[in-house]
């Protein structure tokens, strides 16, 4: 997937990089997966009870999640406001307002699912051009791009649902298998594997004492990120911006992309609080191998909100 945006990126907050060194060392102490579906279902039942109970969870038809995120790009960091809108069974929207270092406008990056349709877009200003290349780095057709986005966004959607309410995307027929025991920092953890179509696979770690979900892990290609400076919108015409974008795309297309490296990704779930009878995580920390890539601090959940009729349509 290619994400093109415009924003200024301040120096990285190095404290983001010091999180969870113990976690990474002990994470793989779980034994090889045991095809014990009954044990996996028992762990899942205990966990769903711990975060609110089956009756409360069954009432959830939608969620709106608001907060602030910080994301690292090498030695740079950017951040802003994030709003996630979910309407079950198959509507999903993420809107990231990327703060632009004091400029009058911020770049709004949007990605969404509306049934089987996937889309993304961006708007606004800034002073940095960043493009994230998908595996292979080749230019995809519009049809290929939409299919790739559908797979990526569906997997992301399911990971958010599992992290928050232990419910995968309803249309995703998943299997649960017991994977053993491990440690997440100082907590003993039960571990289950969740797998489904389109190579969806995630490992979920639950506190053995409280049964609260602590961590998700999965594997995927390491993102390839390229950056270039360009004039800010205040000093550039639309033609200047178009030319800068075309030059960056031409340069990336002419390079031979490396074979994508498969790496481990982690989502650490902390700061659980009560919301309308549910116990929900209010901080999600995303790691690529041992490096913290993003922190998402949630300030507000709204259960079963009323959404505008056209919210999930491409805009």
Residue ranges and their predicted role:
Residues 42-132, 172-180:
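N-terminal mature ectodomain segment of secretory-pathway/periplasmic proteins
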Residues 152-193, 214:
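Short, conserved active-site entrance elements at the starts or edges of catalytic domains
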Residues 73-77, 102, 157, 198-201, ...:
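Solvent-exposed loop/turn segments connecting transmembrane beta-strands
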Residues 31-35:
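Sec/Tat signal peptide C-region and signal peptidase I cleavage site
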Residues 21-30:
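Bacterial N-terminal signal peptides
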Residues 1-4, 12-19:
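Positively charged n-region of N-terminal signal peptides that target proteins for export
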Residues 117-160:
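Acidic/charged, solvent-exposed loop-and-adjacent secondary-structure segments enriched in E/D, K/R, S/T
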Residues 181-315:
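Gly/Pro-enriched, hydrophobic low-complexity segments
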């Amino acid at each position: 997937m290619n994400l093109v945006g415009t924003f200024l990126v301040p120096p990285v907050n190095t404290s983001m990089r010091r999180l969870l060194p113990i976690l990474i060392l002990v994470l793989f102490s779980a034994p090889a997966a045991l095809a014990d579906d009954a044990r996996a279902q028992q762990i899942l039942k205990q966990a769903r009870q711990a975060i609110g109970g089956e009756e409360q969870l069954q009432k959830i038809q939608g969620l709106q999640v608001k907060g602030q995120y910080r994301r690292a790009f090498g030695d740079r960091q950017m951040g802003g406001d994030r709003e996630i809108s979910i309407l079950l069974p198959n509507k999903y929207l993420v809107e990231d307002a990327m703060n632009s270092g004091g400029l009058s406008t911020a770049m709004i990056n949007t990605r969404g699912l509306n049934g089987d349709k996937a889309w993304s877009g961006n708007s606004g200003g800034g002073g940095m051009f960043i493009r994230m290349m998908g595996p292979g780095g080749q230019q995809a057709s519009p049809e290929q791009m939409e299919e790739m986005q559908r797979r990526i966004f569906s997997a992301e959607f399911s990971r958010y649902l599992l992290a928050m309410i232990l419910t995968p995307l309803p249309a995703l027929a998943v299997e649960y298998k017991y994977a053993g025991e491990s440690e997440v920092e100082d907590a003993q953890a039960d571990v289950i594997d969740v797998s489904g179509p389109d190579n969806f696979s995630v490992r979920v770690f639950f506190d053995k004492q409280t049964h609260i979900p602590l961590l998700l892990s999965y594997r995927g290609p390491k993102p390839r990120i390229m950056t270039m400076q360009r004039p800010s919108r205040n000093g550039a015409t639309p033609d200047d911006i178009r030319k800068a974008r075309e030059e960056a795309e031409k340069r990336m297309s002419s390079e031979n992309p490396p074979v994508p490296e498969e790496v481990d990704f982690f989502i650490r779930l902390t700061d659980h609080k009560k919301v309308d009878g549910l116990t929900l995580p209010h901080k999600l920390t995303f790691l690529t191998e041992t490096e913290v890539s993003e922190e998402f601090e949630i300030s507000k959940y709204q259960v079963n909100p009323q959404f505008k009729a056209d919210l999930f349509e491409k805009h």
